[in-house]
Amino acid sequence: MSSPRYESLAAIPSYSNTFIGRGHHIHAIHTRLQQADTRLITLLGPGGIGKTRLALRMAEEVQALFRDGILFVPLDAVEEADLLSFYIAQQLNMKSQKQEDWLQAVILSLQEKELLLVLDNLEQIIQSAIQIDQILKHCPKVRILVTSRIVLDLSYEIEYPLDGLSRPNANLFPGPIDLLKFDAIRLFVQKAQASKPSFSLTEANAPHVVQICQKLDGLP
């Protein structure tokens, strides 16, 4: 059976604002992806913690490591586990196949590829782990980066739990310049300036900003 035809990989979604924080995770995951035995990495955490944004930042960071690039597959609208292969095929711009052939078609397309497959919001269809297992078994140069609220429970899965961004102690109020050392504060200022460019961190508003970041537990 010949490999299905596909066009160039879909572009990685991008953001106009600067990525803030997660330096430790970026370094650790980058190092992991340079190791030959790393096949599957899962970014774990509750909704809103920043898993998707970190996955996209990682995709940009490690793009040069993969001869055939990055394939980003958003799964937030998918409700049936059987459709995982179909959505991967869509991002590959593959031509139509019979529904029962999608997994095999994806494997045939990727088996000689050296790429990073990013599966975003996999908790929607966590039962699709068996398909991921098959892709990894038959596509030896494919690595997979998953974002999920739930582990896949595969033997070679490497988990990276995410928590809130760094923030100051609620009882301590250093000056505005020192506060900007904390990722949650820097992100708050960035978002505030996006809607009100004149906003700046001052002695007057700093306690309120710290309080907000604490109440949000450092969530982006």
Name each region found by the language model:
Residues 1-220:
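Aliphatic-rich helical/repeat scaffold segments used for oligomerization and domain docking
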